[in-house]
């Protein structure tokens, strides 16, 4: 998953952000 805390990391697959 691309989530890190409350944010989404760039360059990752979407994970319901």
Swiss-Prot record:
UniProt PTM comment: Contains 3 disulfide bonds. They are not added, since framework IV presents two different connectivities (I-V, II-III, IV-VI and I-III, II-V, IV-VI).
Tissue specificity field: Expressed by the venom duct.
Q: Name one GO cellular component term.
A: extracellular region
Site keyed Important for binding and activity: positions: 4
The protein's GO terms of the molecular function aspect are: sodium channel regulator activity; toxin activity
Q: Which UniProt keywords apply?
A: Disulfide bond, Ion channel impairing toxin, Neurotoxin, Secreted, Toxin, Voltage-gated sodium channel impairing toxin
Q: Where in the cell is it found?
A: Secreted
Top-level taxon of origin: Eukaryota
Q: What is its main location?
A: secreted
Q: Could you tell me which cysteines form disulfide bridges?
A: none
The record's domain comment reads: The cysteine framework is IV (CC-C-C-C-C).
- Family designation: Belongs to the conotoxin M superfamily.
What functional role does this protein have?
Mu-conotoxins block voltage-gated sodium channels (Nav). Blocks reversibly sodium channels in molluskan neurons, but has no effect on sodium currents in bovine chromaffin cells or in rat brain synaptosomes. Induces paralysis in bivalve mollusks (Mytilus). No effect are observed on fish (Gambusia) and fly larvae (Sarcophaga). PnIVB is approximately 6 times more potent than PnIVA in blockade of the sodium current in Lymnaea neurons.
The protein's name in its UniProt record: Mu-conotoxin PnIVA
């Amino acid at each position: 998953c691309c989530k890190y805390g409350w944010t989404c990391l760039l360059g990752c697959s979407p994970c319901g952000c």
